[in-house]
UniProtKB/Swiss-Prot annotation:
Annotated EC: 2.4.1.328
Family: Belongs to the glycosyltransferase 28 family.
One GO MF term: hexosyltransferase activity
Enzyme type, top EC level: transferase
Record's keyword annotation contains NADP: no
Function comment: Involved in the biosynthesis of the macrolide antibiotic erythromycin. Catalyzes the reversible transfer of mycarosyl from dTDP-beta-L-mycarose to erythronolide B to yield 3-alpha-L-mycarosylerythronolide B. It can also use TDP-beta-L-cladinose.
Protein name: Erythronolide mycarosyltransferase
Biological processes, Gene Ontology terms: antibiotic biosynthetic process
Record Pfam families: EryCIII-like_C, EryCIII-like_N
Entry annotated with the keyword Nucleotidyltransferase: no
Keywords assigned: Antibiotic biosynthesis, Glycosyltransferase, Transferase
Length: 415
């Protein structure tokens, strides 16, 4: 069958789609990836066939006032301490309004939707798999008669909050049932003769790649697949080609955005605290310029994460799904300094399961970070629990093993 994957131009979101794309390809299906032009190199680098459509989004160009409105509903979504607030009608409606006004129309811009629909109508895929913010994929699927599903790269917050919102909305008086996402999707789909249905918001089904302990209960039809982290095309550097008898720690992701790395002096103090660790610390990604670093700290712009973590005792990161999944896959303890979207939740879940420590970015400092590192490295129960989570993840079917199920669902939903 013909399978079309689609994602707005966000490299790490796309990377979460790659293992299933290749599973479908090696099963004999014709697979193409339609995305905004900025993603083309990443698609080609994954060895997949790219179809550039539309113009690039400008999500990260939104003005600070608008960003603040969006962040209210996407930062510090603390399920452990804000549960009542997060499930209130006011919060759920506010989230639907903010994302449907300032996020979804921006990443699904008019030219992207129109050209994606044109391509789908011409190529006639049997199945469209879409990244969960890329609602253009659902519209294109309905416009050409294809089956369609969301391919989740992380925690299903969109489906979870949409389900809670709809449950409360339908209990309200008929004259007071606003639906910002439904209104926006009705307008977008209507341009192509497609009527709104809830499947445009949540797919006809979803593919969830998180292990059982981390899945959110959405009540929606879901196909479970094993998380197989893909970190992008890469080359192993010389210093990483051979194993090392020295213990390693990895620090990656958004370091420069934390208060403990606000400037070169603060960054240097943070590194000095971490350097007390008996072993090598590999710091990846950009940070403030510093003239000197301790001898046991290696600063690198990029490193193949899957290769590095094979020989790491722990990782400190920002909670991103790809980094988290790679650490999970290798069974190492994780220290998450996270607050964005689903990053906080996974960090808290990992900590609750005894496989790591969660730290709030607005509270962490060099001392607390160094203390957490010592704790997860010196206490063997963290590694033991991380290995248990790895084993749990390995119990899920591989992407290749779910292909027959996707074929069956495609036959059921097509047309």
């Amino acid at each position: 069958m013909r399978v079309l994957l689609t994602s707005f131009a966000h490299r790490t979101h796309f990377q979460g789609l790659v293992p299933l794309a290749w599973a479908l390809r090696t099963a004999g299906h014709d697979v193409r990836v339609a995305a905004q032009p900025a993603l083309t190199d990443a698609v080609i680098g994954a060895g997949l066939t790219a179809v550039p459509v539309g113009s690039d989004h400008r999500l990260f160009d939104i003005v600070p006032e608008v960003a603040a409105q969006v962040h209210r509903y996407s930062f510090y979504l603390d399920f452990y301490h804000r549960e009542q607030e997060l499930h209130s009608w006011e919060f759920l409606l506010g989230m639907q309004e903010a994302t449907s006004r300032w996020v979804y129309p921006v990443v699904n811009n008019d030219s992207f939707v129109a050209e994606l629909v044109d391509f789908a109508r011409d190529w006639r895929p049997d199945l469209v798999l879409w990244e969960p913010f890329t609602f253009a994929g659902a519209v294109a699927a309905r416009a050409c008669g294809a089956a369609h599903a969301r391919l989740l790269w992380g925690s299903d917050l969109t489906g979870y909050f949409r389900g809670r919102f709809q449950a409360q909305r339908l209990r309200r008086p008929p004259e007071d049932r606003p639906d910002p996402l439904g209104t926006w999707l009705t307008e977008v789909a209507g341009r192509f003769g497609v009527e709104f249905g809830e499947d445009l918001a949540v797919g006809q089904w979803s593919v969830d790649q998180l292990p059982p302990s981390f899945r959110l209960d959405t009540g929606m039809e879901t196909v479970v697949a094993r998380t197989l982290p893909y970190n992008g095309a890469s080359v192993v550097p010389d210093w990483l080609k051979k194993g090392s008898a020295t213990r390693r720690i990895c620090i990656t992701g958004g370091f420069s955005g934390l208060g403990l790395a606000a400037d070169a002096d603060q960054f240097a103090r943070t590194l000095a605290q971490l350097a007390r660790f008996d072993g090598e610390i590999v710091v990846t990604g950009s940070g403030p310029d510093t003239s000197a670093v301790p001898d046991n700290i290696r600063l690198v712009d990029f490193v193949p994460m899957g290769v590095l973590l094979q020989n790491c005792a722990a990782i400190i990161h920002h909670g991103g799904a790809g980094t988290w999944a790679t650490a999970l896959h290798h069974g190492i303890p994780q220290i998450s300094v996270a607050h964005e979207w689903d990053c906080m939740l996974r960090g808290q879940q990992t900590a609750e399961l005894g496989a790591g420590i969660y730290l709030r970015p607005d509270e962490v400092d060099a001392d607390s970070l160094a203390s957490a590192l010592t704790q997860v490295v010196e206490d063997p129960t963290y590694t033991e629990n991380a290995v248990k989570l790895r084993e749990e993840a390995l119990s899920d079917p591989t992407p290749q093993e779910i292909v027959p199920r996707l074929e069956e669902l495609t036959r059921r939903h097509a047309g």
